[in-house]
């Protein structure tokens, strides 16, 4: 279950301007990612694992950095049509921005990119029964790993856990 949570791209919903000069792609200060995050997009080379009821399809609600360097992920995923809340700990590895967790095999979760305020992208590698699965988020990053638009799922339109808690209120009609 823990692996599910990390298998997605996370994007912080914020009313701030994106500045490409603040994007980090190495030497991460992971303590700065603690806070409320919302899953926006997921991509995988095995779409069955991130489709509805897939074992890697999760909706992250919160990430907390621990003093020992590990990360706590608070997320929901679907079990028999119901959103189930789960909290998992991913152990820090020797590599900067990389974590490990056992779930449906051995997994590594690594920060791929972040600006610490508006978005963060995690790259998950799952090794199970001799098969390796890659899962990540945000279209721009996906292409770097050979995952095209056909491998991407928009969680904001399709995920019942997302719509249950985080759907934007209806906007008033525009007046011309």
UniProtKB/Swiss-Prot annotation:
Signal peptide annotation: 1-15
Record-linked SUPFAM superfamilies: Lipocalins (SSF50814)
InterPro entries given in the database record: Calycin, Lipocalin, Lipocalin_CS, Lipocln_cytosolic_FA-bd_dom, Maj_urinary
Glycosylation sites: 68, 129
Keyword Transcription regulation: no
Primary residence: secreted
Disulphide-bonded residues: 83-161
GO terms under cellular component: extracellular space
GO MF term list: small molecule binding
Subcellular location: Secreted
Family matches, as PROSITE patterns: LIPOCALIN
Keyword set, alphabetical order: Disulfide bond, Glycoprotein, Secreted, Signal, Transport
Stated family: Belongs to the calycin superfamily. Lipocalin family.
Protein name: Epididymal-specific lipocalin-9
Organism: Homo sapiens (Human)
Lineage, highest ranks first: Eukaryota, Metazoa, Chordata, Craniata, Vertebrata
């Amino acid at each position: 279950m823990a692996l599910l949570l990390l298998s997605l791209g996370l994007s912080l919903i914020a009313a701030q301007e994106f500045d490409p000069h603040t994007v980090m792609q190495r030497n991460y200060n992971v303590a700065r990612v603690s806070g409320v995050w919302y899953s926006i997009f997921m991509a995988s080379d095995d779409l069955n694992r991130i489709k509805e009821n897939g074992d890697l399809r999760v909706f992250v609600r919160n990430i907390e950095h621990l003093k020992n360097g590990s990360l706590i992920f608070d997320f929901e995923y679907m079990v028999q049509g119901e959103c189930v809340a789960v909290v998992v700990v991913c152990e820090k590895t020797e590599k900067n921005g990389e974590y490990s967790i056992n779930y449906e095999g051995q997994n590594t979760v690594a920060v791929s990119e972040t600006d610490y305020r508006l978005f963060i992208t995690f790259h998950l590698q799952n090794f199970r029964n001799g098969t390796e699965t890659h899962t990540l988020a945000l279209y721009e990053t996906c292409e770097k790993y050979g995952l095209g638009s056909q491998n991407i799922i928009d969680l904001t339109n399709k995920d019942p856990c997302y719509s249950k808690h985080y759907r934007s209120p209806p906007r008033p009609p525009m007046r011309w």
